[in-house]
Structure formats: C-alpha cells, structure tokens
C-alpha cells in the first residue's frame, strides 16, 4: 500500500454519505449494536435464564438493533442500494467467496459441535441477526460515512473500530492474551468484509459470511482447544491473504492517485 493510494478520495461522490459531523455519527452508530447486545445479555443474566433463554433474549435484542440500522439507512440521503443492499457484482474479483467458505469450514473442523440440539434454532436466529446487525452498522453506515476520507482509509478506520469494540468482551472471563487475539482477528474480519463491500458493492456477501462464521463458532461452544487455536491461526493467514487479494481488486479510481 503506497501513501498516495492510502490518501486518495473516491472518484464517485455517491460513495460517500455527506453528514455534518462524520466522526460523531460514526462513533454513535458504532455503539448501537454494542448497547443492544449488552442489554440483551444483561436482561438474560438478571432473569437467570439458561443458555436457550439467553440466546433467544439476545437474538431478540439484536434483531431490534438490526431494524434500527435498516431504518437509519432507509431514512438517510443515500438509497438502500447505495448502502449495499443490492445484488453483489464482480464475484470473480472476490474469488466467488471461496476463501470465506474455507474459513467457515476451518472453524467447524477445529471446534466441531458442542451444543445441545435444542439450542441450535436459537443460535441460528441469533447469528443471522448479528450478521445483519453488525454488517448494517459497521460496513453499511460507518463505512459509508468514512468513505468521505477515501475508500482505503474507510476500510482501515471501520476495521479498527470494529476490532476495538470487541474489547466489550473484557468482562467475559477470557485471558488477556485471548482477548487481544480476538480483537486482532475482529479487526481483520472487519477489514475483509469492508473490502467485500468496496469490491462487490453489496453487503450481502459479508452478511452471509458473518452469520455462517458465527453459527459454526457458537456450535463449537467457543472452544479454546489446541486444535481450535491452530485452526484460528490458519484462519488468520487465509483471511490475511484474501484481504491482500481484495485490496488489489479495489476499483482503480479509488486507490490510484
């Protein structure tokens, strides 16, 4: 990545969302999914719900959050199509999303299925809601606002925000090392999914990947076995390589001085 490429502004003004206070909108929008998700978990904890009740409660909260994101995009000046609610283009440039399917398969192979069958429908609802919610906000709203600074910077900024906000998991009992790894992986995840929006013009590939990834991760019971950690390392390499590939396929008008 050259400094000149990093600083380029998008050639198409339709790529941007002209808001008056971009960073205020960005930070405020970024916190909405966190607040709804945390609220869902808090309600479940206060009510002493079991795992099924917790999944259902959080899924309901996240679904409401996703609808809030959809409402914001619908009421904004750009159309829903401009935000990425459209059929993806340039599938070949994204390698037909094969690396994403490989990452999901690696998670499944590394963690297997460790949850009881009764909670699977609730997990599927939750992960689909999370995929819609986080892609609407971080790759839809936040990425659109940040594109005023150039597509390349928007990819980096939105990815960093997405990664840092995963520090919200600080109170879940994970070790500091595992938490740092999670933040780094989340930033890489956000980097690749933002690139997908820039290359394909659509949020749907990222939504599908996000939902599928979270589904197999939940089914594995958030395993931290040696096999799962090796799988995570391979995922990082694969996502990093895919991110490099997508970076080179960004529209030239957006990365060339």
Regions found by a protein language model. Give the residues of each.
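Membrane-interface helix/loop boundary segments of multi-pass membrane proteins
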Residues: 133-159, 198-202
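C-terminal membrane module of polytopic membrane proteins
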Residues: 3-10, 49-53, 71, 211-257
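Juxtamembrane helix-loop-helix connectors linking adjacent transmembrane helices
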Residues: 43-59, 73-136, 143, 147-148, ...
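Juxtamembrane helix-entry segments on the extracytoplasmic side of multipass membrane proteins
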Residues: 112-124, 171-185, 225-229
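Short, Lys/Arg-rich, polar N-terminal cytosolic tail immediately upstream
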Residues: 1-19, 81
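Alpha-helical transmembrane segments
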Residues: 21-38, 93-105, 155-161, 238-239
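Alpha-helical transmembrane segments in multi-pass membrane proteins
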Residues: 20-74, 121-122, 230-237
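Functionally important transmembrane alpha-helices
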Residues: 179-236
């Amino acid at each position: 990545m050259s400094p000149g490429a990093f600083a380029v502004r998008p050639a198409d003004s339709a790529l941007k969302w002209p808001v008056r206070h971009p960073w205020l909108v960005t930070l405020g929008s970024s916190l909405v999914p966190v607040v709804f998700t945390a609220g869902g978990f808090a309600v479940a904890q206060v009510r002493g719900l079991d795992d099924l009740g917790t999944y259902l409660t959080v899924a309901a909260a996240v679904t409401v959050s996703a609808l809030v994101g959809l409402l914001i995009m619908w009421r904004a000046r750009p159309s829903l199509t401009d935000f990425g609610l459209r059929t993806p283009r340039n599938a070949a440039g994204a390698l037909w999303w094969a690396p994403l399917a490989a990452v999901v398969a690696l998670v499944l192979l590394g963690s297997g299925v460790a949850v009881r069958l009764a909670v699977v429908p609730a997990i599927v609802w939750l992960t689909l809601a999370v995929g819609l919610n986080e892609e609407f906000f971080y790759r839809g709203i936040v990425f659109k606002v940040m594109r005023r600074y150039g597509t390349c910077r928007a990819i980096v900024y939105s990815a960093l925000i997405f990664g840092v906000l995963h520090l919200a998991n600080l109170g879940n009992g994970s070790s500091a090392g595992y938490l740092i790894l999670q933040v780094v992986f989340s930033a890489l995840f956000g980097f690749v999914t933002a690139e997908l929006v820039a290359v394909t013009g659509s949020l749907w590939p990222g939504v599908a990947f996000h939902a599928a990834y979270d589904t197999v991760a939940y089914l594995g019971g958030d395993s931290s076995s040696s096999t799962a950690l090796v799988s995570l390392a391979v995922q990082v390499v694969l996502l990093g390589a895919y991110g490099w590939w997508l970076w080179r396929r960004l529209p030239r008008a957006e990365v060339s001085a």
